[in-house]
Regions:
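Disordered, low-complexity tails and leader-like regions
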Residues: 38, 236-238
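Conserved small/polar residues in nucleotide/adenosyl-binding loops
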Residues: 240-242
Length: 242
């Protein structure tokens, strides 16, 4: 399942004002834009490339709807001949990218765009947004998975993510980084990855005691039972109750 939203206006205003500048000056040379980073995150010695799938979906659906053009007209920044051009806009360039899950290093291009400058300018912001965020999450996940020394790591970041998209695509990126499952059900549906989970502290607190809560949950899900031990006494009775 793909993300069917039209994200064409997911860009900085200056990309569009520069596009109009190129249009008005009748200049649209073919250029090369490289997306890269200067420093590994988390003091890491490497990073993990991610975000390519969403980037491809974004490029495939890149077009200005009538609603988009009407909105841009309302800003009073754009002339009618340029807005007419946008209605017929399609991306015609070439994109080269490192496969997701690849180990990458500073100043190494993750995505290379070869296109007329008006087109390359437009896609710059969204591609950086998509690739930077998801590569960050994949890198963090990879480091956690490595530190776990072979124990399975699950992704539970949705409730702490910076909004729905960060949770949805961050979960996918964590899987690329080596996690064995995610708590995000929509990520599981959209990208066909395993969904896994435990129970909440509220489940424990809704029963007379912790042992009863554990027992009832284990009876319900004998083949998929992961118990949360840090509601009351993490290193004491909680472990004994298991």
């Amino acid at each position: 399942m793909s993300d069917s939203r039209n994200l064409t206006l997911l860009t900085d205003l200056y990309e569009l004002t520069m596009m109009q500048g190129y249009f008005k000056n009748h200049t649209n040379p073919t250029v090369v834009f490289d997306a890269f980073f200067r420093k590994n995150p988390f003091d890491s010695s490497y990073s993990i490339a991610a975000g390519l799938e969403q980037a491809i979906e974004y490029i495939k659906d890149l077009h200005f709807s009538q609603e988009d053009v009407d909105y841009l007209r309302s800003t009073r920044l754009f002339d009618e001949d340029f807005l007419e051009y946008l209605l017929n806009f399609r991306f015609s360039g070439d994109i080269y990218a490192i496969p997701e899950g690849t180990v990458v290093f500073p100043r190494e291009p993750l995505v290379k765009v070869i296109a007329p400058i008006m087109e390359a300018q437009l896609v710059e912001t969204a591609l950086l947004n998509i690739v930077n965020h998801q590569s960050l999450i994949a890198t963090k996940a990879s480091r956690v998975v490595y530190a776990a020394g072979g124990d399975g790591i699950m992704e539970f970041g949705l409730r702490r993510a910076q909004g729905p998209d960060a949770g949805l695509y961050g979960a996918r990126a964590a899987m690329i980084g080596g996690c064995i499952g995610t708590s995000c059900v929509l990520t599981g549906q959209m990208f066909n990855v395993p969904v896994k989970g435990t129970h909440a502290h509220s489940w424990i607190m809704s029963f007379p005691d912790e042992y009863t809560a554990f027992k009832k949950y284990a009876e319900l899900y004998p083949d998929a039972c992961i118990l949360l031990v840090d509601t009351y006494d993490t290193l004491g009775l909680s472990l004994i109750h298991i």
